[in-house]
């Protein structure tokens, strides 16, 4: 299943740009990236490239006779799209992005303590920026790709960054009840469960109702948790699971400390930033 992550990522990026005909083209590009050296970065490029390849083919096919235009989505788009994608990946994307990806993984393996903490800070914060959106997914896929490269501390920072927002919101609904509506207070405890299970999306309704105050608080707490996870040299070899994979976390006790610290920081900031509900 892990081997399909990059192809699926590339396929759905492509589909978001070029609609359904781009899915197969993006998937093929992601497969080439997954089997080559470009990895996550190559899959990202493949997804965008596939989407725009299909858009280009659509404009070209619009000038063809109507009889040919009707078969374009099922014949011309996939055949020419996959052909172009294969050439692009093998002769352009793989050499360039492969070199960048190799250098990046080497740098991550050899980085000093300060640099590791900074990476954890950034990735943890990204997990809370849009809570399930592009930034969140980019950080998550980078974390899972790092597992394959043997950098298990990165995945630990990513997961803890995603666990923090729901846990923090749940804690804030208990500590600062006057800052939340009755419905939000009732939904608060559920976020504890979702946060511990690494389901960041549980925080979305709270962020959507007050993004200017909720998002900054969650980002700061998640960034702090990610940085602490790196500072404590915590590691994680599983791509998901939340508290259920704590038995395979390296330095699990300190990992829990980092989670509690990030949760408390975000909860306190929520209490300070949010306005009192009438």
Name what the model sees in each region.
Residues 1-66, 70-277:
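Pore-lining transmembrane helices
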């Amino acid at each position: 299943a892990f081997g399909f992550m990059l192809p699926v990522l590339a396929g759905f990026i492509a589909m978001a740009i070029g609609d359904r005909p781009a899915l197969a083209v993006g998937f093929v590009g992601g497969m080439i990236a997954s089997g080559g050296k470009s990895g996550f970065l190559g899959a990202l490029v493949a997804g965008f490239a596939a989407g725009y390849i299909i858009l280009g083919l659509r404009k070209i096919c619009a000038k063809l006779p109507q009889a040919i235009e009707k078969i374009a989505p099922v014949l011309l788009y996939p055949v020419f799209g996959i052909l172009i994608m294969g050439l692009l990946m093998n002769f352009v994307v793989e050499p360039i992005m492969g070199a960048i990806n190799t250098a990046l993984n080497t740098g991550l393996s050899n980085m000093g303590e300060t640099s590791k903490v900074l990476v954890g800070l950034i990735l943890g914060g990204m997990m809370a920026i849009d809570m399930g959106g592009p930034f969140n997914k980019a950080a998550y896929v980078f974390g899972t790709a790092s597992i394959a490269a043997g950098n298990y501390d990165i995945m630990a920072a990513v997961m803890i960054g995603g666990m923090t927002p729901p846990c923090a919101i749940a804690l804030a609904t208990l500590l600062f009840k006057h800052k939340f509506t009755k419905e939000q207070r009732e939904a608060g405890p559920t976020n504890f469960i979702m946060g511990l299970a690494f389901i960041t999306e549980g925080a979305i309704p709270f962020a959507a109702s007050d993004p200017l105050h909720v998002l900054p608080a969650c980002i700061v707490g998640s960034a702090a948790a990610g940085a602490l996870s790196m500072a404590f040299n915590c590691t994680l070899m599983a791509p998901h699971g939340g508290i259920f994979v704590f038995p395979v976390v390296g330095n699990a006790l300190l990992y829990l400390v980092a989670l509690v610290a990030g949760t408390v920081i975000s909860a306190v900031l929520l209490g300070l930033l949010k306005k009192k509900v009438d």
